[in-house]
Amino acid sequence: GVAKALRTVPVAIEQARMIERLSPDAWLVSFTNPAGLITQAISAHTRARVVGICDTPVELFHNIARALGEPAEDVECEYVGLNHLGWIRAVRLRGVDIIDRVLADDAILRQLYLAPLFDFDMLRALRLIPTEYLYFFYERRRALDNQRASGASRGGEIERLNRSLIGDLRSRLDASDTTGAVQTYAAYLAQRSGSYMKLEAEAGSAFAPDLAPQPDPFRASTGYHRIAVDVMSALTGARPSRHVVNVRNQGAMAELADDDIVEIAADIDRDRIVPIPAAPLPSAVQGLVRSFKAYEHAAIEAALSGSHLDACKAMLIHPAIGEWSPSRRMLDELFGHEHDDGHCAGPAHWRAQAAG
C-alpha cells in the first residue's frame, strides 16, 4: 500500500497532466492501486476527469448471489466506504432486504470469501459484510502470524509467478504457439486468483497443489476487464448503468469532504458520473473511514514532498499501523535509512530510492 503509493503517485499525476493537456475532455479510468489513493491524488492535483475502478465490491456481490443460488441481476447490494475499506449493509433480493438472513447462515457466509477471513459472529455484531481487505484491520495479528509462519509474502509469491509466466510466454511465442501462450496466461491468472488471501488467512501458498479450480478468467462475469468495459460503455452513453466506483464524494457520504474520493455506487451516463447519496455510516466504522482517509491525504503529501518524516507520519496515521517506531523501521527497510529532518527531496525521491 504505502510503498506503492509513494512510488506511484508522482507518476500517476504526471500522466494525468499529460491527458489533461492533450485531451482535456477525456475520461481517465484508473486501475492503478491503491485505487482510491491514486484517484484522490489525480483528482486533487490535476483537472483530469478521473474515475477509479476496483473489482473487489462486485466480486463480493456476485459471491453473495452465488451463495444464495440467485441470478446476480436479482440481488442488489448497498455498498459504502473507501477503496479496500468498504462494507455491504443491505442485501436486497428482488427488492427485499435479506441481510439478516445472509448473516444468520454460516453456509452462505463460508462462500463469500476465497479463504476463511472473519469470525461470523463479528459480522453479526457489526451487521455488515466487509470486503476482504478489512481482514487486515479486524485480524491484523492473525494475518501477520500467518505471513511469518509461511516464511513468504504475497508480493514475493507474485514476483515468482510473474517470472515464471514471462519465461513460459517467451518460450511459447518463440515457438509461434499463440494458443499455448493464451492458455499459459489463463493458467497464471487462475493460480494467482485461486491463491488470493490464502497466505494471510491460512499460511498457505500460491504454489500449493490443492488450490481450488477457478473459472475461465476470459469468460468470467467479474474482474477488472469486465468493470472497465462496463464503465467505459456507460461513459460513452452506449449502456448507462450503475456501478461502484471511486469518485468525488460530492456530498454522498456526509462524514467526508465533498472532494474526498469515496468508493460508492454511482449512476454513469454519457460524460457524467453521479454518486448515489448514502445513509450515515454505522458508528462502528465511522472512525476507521475517517482515519484511513486522513492517511490517504498524508501519503499523497509524502509522495510529492519526498520527505521521510512525511512518510512516517502517513504510516503513523494508518489505522493498521499506528506506531512511530515500526513505521520508521519499515520505511528504512523499503527505501533506505534516511533521517531528513523535514527536508523535502521531491517526488522522484521514492523511485530513485527503491531502484537503488
Please provide the spans of the model-predicted regions.
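Soluble or luminal CAZymes and related metallo-dependent hydrolases
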Residues: 4-11, 56, 223, 291
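Rossmann-fold NAD(P)-binding glycine/threonine-rich loop
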Residues: 1-45
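Beta-sheet entry/capping signal
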Residues: 26-28, 49-50, 76
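Short acidic, glycine/serine/threonine-rich loops at helix termini
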Residues: 39-44, 63-64, 89-91
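A structural signal for short, well-ordered beta-strand segments and their strand-loop junctions
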Residues: 28-32, 52-54, 244
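Long, compositionally biased stretches enriched for glycine and/or charged residues
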Residues: 69-356
